[in-house]
Design a protein with these regions (language model features):
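ATP-binding pocket architecture of kinase catalytic cores
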Residues: 36-113
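Central hydrophobic cores of alpha-helical transmembrane segments
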Residues: 230-236
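Juxta-kinase regulatory segment immediately upstream of eukaryotic protein kinase catalytic domains
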Residues: 1-24
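ATP-dependent phospho-/nucleotidyl transfer catalytic cores
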Residues: 25, 115-176, 212, 276-299
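Active-site Asp-x-Gly
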Residues: 181-229
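ATP/Mg2+ or Mg2+-diphosphate-binding catalytic cores
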Residues: 242-299
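Hydrophobic alpha-helix feature that most strongly marks membrane-spanning transmembrane helices
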Residues: 202, 209, 219-223, 236, ...
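Membrane-cytosol interface segments
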Residues: 29-31
Length: 299
């Protein structure tokens, strides 16, 4: 989602050539470059799924999202070096993330859809394995850690073995959970409601907020709202690691310091995250809302 490929003078030319907006100044925040025009702030977000953006456009212009700015051609997607971007006007929303996660959501259709997580994860496993062959023995930090996270990925896929023909309603969900990108149209997709809740639990851990919150109370409060077998599978699924490998691949296998530091931090947190999942699993077992999983050790 970030505008990694639009930096320096390039961004000024990009906006000048595509939009009727003059840049007064710019600054970096939340992994984006912000551009000020009078008292308005704008930023560019990469479009990873153009089809998804078109499909959900009605919700973006009628809901609480950052405003999409049309370009000079009357289109909302602009292209630079074969990558698609949108310009968004920042709107300040005052909200508590936990309130939005817990809030009852309306399904976007009265027709249930097939859950595709398992197939997506299998495809991603094959894709990462193929790409990894190009950098074997190039980066020790990946060579020494990738088998562990492959193991987690296989475990998550295994947990969904009974959900290959599972149907449920779809909701507006988020690719990533964080405060700033919560209202970013490029961060929205259709999925089952378990996606946001499980990713919120991940967010609490990796933002180090879980120590200040009673996770067991969050779980118990939502026992009747979610399928916790799906949530456990998604908690185990190590997208936080493989997303960084995706960035490395997108960056032509050039390892920048940000990616290195983030992977290093994830590896340092492995034991703590296992304990975190174990504690959540214990609460779920005690409340009989989940199947027993032999490979999860209760600490």
């Amino acid at each position: 989602m970030h505008s990694y490929y639009l930096i320096g003078d390039i961004i000024f030319e990009f906006i000048k050539n595509n939009y009727l907006i003059n840049i007064d100044e710019y600054f970096y925040k939340n992994n984006y470059i912000f551009y000020k025009n009078r008292n308005n702030y704008y930023f560019i977000s990469e479009v990873k799924n153009k089809k998804n953006l078109y499909k959900l456009y009605y919700y973006f212009i009628n809901g609480y999202f950052y405003k999409i700015i049309f370009n000079k051609k009357g289109k909302f997607i602009s292209t630079y070096q074969n990558k698609d971007y949108i310009l968004l006007k920042y709107i300040k929303y005052n909200f508590k993330l936990e309130d939005l996660i817990y809030k009852n959501k309306l399904a976007l259709s009265n027709k249930k859809k097939l859950l595709t997580w398992r197939n997506i994860w299998i495809d991603r496993s094959n894709y990462i394995e193929e790409k990894y062959q190009k950098i074997i023995n190039k980066y020790n930090i990946i060579d020494e850690s990738i088998d562990y996270f492959y193991g987690l990925l296989e475990a998550a896929i295994y947990l969904l073995r009974d959900y290959q023909k599972y149907y449920d309603y779809l909701y507006l969900q988020h690719i990533f959970i964080n405060y700033f990108d919560y209202y970013n149209p490029c961060n929205i997709k259709l999925d089952v409601k378990e996606r946001d809740f499980s990713n919120y639990l991940k967010y609490l851990f990796f933002s180090n907020k879980y120590k200040d919150i009673y996770i067991d109370k969050i779980i118990i409060k939502n026992l009747d709202n979610y399928n916790f077998n799906l949530i456990l599978a998604r908690l185990i699924y190590p997208d936080y690691y493989f997303n960084l490998l995706d960035e490395l691949i997108d960056n032509n296998y050039i390892f920048n310091n940000n990616i290195f530091d983030e992977i290093k931090n994830i590896i340092l947190l492995v034991d703590d995250y296992e304990l975190y999942i174990s504690n959540i699993y214990r609460v779920l077992l005690e409340n009989k809302v989940i199947k027993k999983v032999d490979f999860i050790n209760l600490h």
